UniProtKB/Swiss-Prot annotation:
A GO CC term attached to the entry: cytoplasm
Record's keyword annotation contains Methyltransferase: no
Pfam family, one: TMP-TENI
Protein name: Thiamine-phosphate synthase
EC number from the UniProt entry: 2.5.1.3
Gene responsible for this protein: thiE
Length: 351
């Protein structure tokens, strides 16, 4: 006759089930992340780090813990949430699985103290390693998308702001900057949050003009600064290494200084006179040609560029352009976006 479990043994079995479930959860989440590092990013280093963490967890997944598994009797198998039914983008898939891994490691850390305290210590350190992995991967994602982006929309105040931006995103836009120098902070915060959500849905980068605090408040992908704004070093200290920092430049000296200061991309212009930059003389296509030969980081020709003159900028060496009025004032932003991208995509990709 099999003796019933004592109360202590019953608690032990529950702990074993918790450890078993969370080891599975952590390993599964890491495998999902690893697959994107391997096939989506072609990044062997990040994929190898995921694999190392998975193998470390596997060492602790003993037959003793597996034997405690009771899937038919687990009420959690019936629990779900609408947000788990679909994901808006690769970014949301990755974020959800990083959360899954981090939460599982925290559970393992606490309950392992009742099983093997050495595992608890290891899980604590692994959780910090996963935080670092998340930061590095998201930063890599941002930089990779920045390099792939050809068209950059800088917004201007508009009653149709959200509709125009979404129309451009539908046309293939992958990089957006929110710029409004006249609105009060409450409106800026509201609009920035909505734009950031749109970019999240469409898998585009979201940059905030000038305001590092606003960029952090809405979890933007970065900030774009002017020559008279916050020093790059301070902005980097506040934003960290994984978010993007762009800088406007008007001549080769400013370009070289920006590269030396470690910005992620620059604006080159204004190529033509534009009401967006009142009082600034156009740099012309000469500066575009100089940038094409001398700039080692992503750069965007900007200032008065539209469907009528984009090919002049391309002929001068531009592979990426930033626009304002040509999309914000377009009757059909989706079609204009598609046309501009069709011209830019004829250029040979950078190696």
């Amino acid at each position: 006759m099999v003796e019933p479990y004592s109360q202590k043994e019953q608690v032990q079995q529950v702990v074993y089930r918790i450890l078993d479930a969370n080891l599975d959860r952590a390993r599964e989440g890491l495998r999902i992340i690893e697959e994107w590092c391997r096939f989506g990013l072609n990044n062997a280093q990040l994929a190898l780090e995921c694999k190392r963490l998975r193998q470390e967890l596997a060492k602790w997944h003993t037959p003793e813990l597996r034997a405690a598994r009771d899937t038919p009797g687990d009420p959690g198998t019936e629990l779900t949430h609408p947000q788990e039914e679909e994901r808006a983008s690769i970014k949301s898939v990755l974020q959800a699985n990083f959360c899954r891994v981090e939460e599982a490691l925290r559970v393992l850390e606490e309950y392992s103290k009742l099983y093997q305290p050495n595992i608890a210590k290891a899980c604590k350190q692994m959780r910090y390693q996963v935080y670092t992995l998340e930061s590095n991967l998201m930063g890599h994602q941002r930089h990779q998308l920045l390099w792939r982006s050809r068209l950059y929309l800088v917004t201007s105040p508009s009653e149709n702001l959200l509709n125009n931006v979404e129309a451009a995103l539908k046309g293939g836009l992958t990089l957006l900057q929110y710029r409004d120098k006249t609105a009060d902070d409450s409106l800026r915060l509201e609009q920035a949050r909505k734009l950031r959500q749109l970019c999240h849905i469409y898998g585009a980068l979201f940059i905030v003009n000038d305001r590092v605090d606003l960029a952090l408040a809405v979890d933007a992908d970065g900030v774009h600064l002017g020559q008279q704004d916050m020093p790059i070093a301070i902005a980097r200290q506040l934003l960290g290494s994984q978010r993007l920092i762009g800088l406007s430049t008007t001549n080769k000296e400013e370009m070289q200084a920006a590269i030396a200061e470690g910005v992620d991309y620059i604006g080159v212009g204004p190529v033509y006179e534009t009401p967006t930059k009142v009082g600034k003389a156009a740099t012309g296509l000469e500066y575009v040609s100089y940038a094409a030969k001398n700039c080692s980081i992503p750069w965007f020709a900007i200032g008065g560029i539209d469907a009528n003159n984009i090919n002049d900028a391309i002929d001068a060496g531009a592979k990426r352009v930033a626009v304002v009025r040509s999309l914000m004032q377009a009757e059909q932003p989706t079609l204009v976006t598609q046309y501009l991208l069709s011209q830019l995509n004829r250029i040979k990709p950078e190696l």
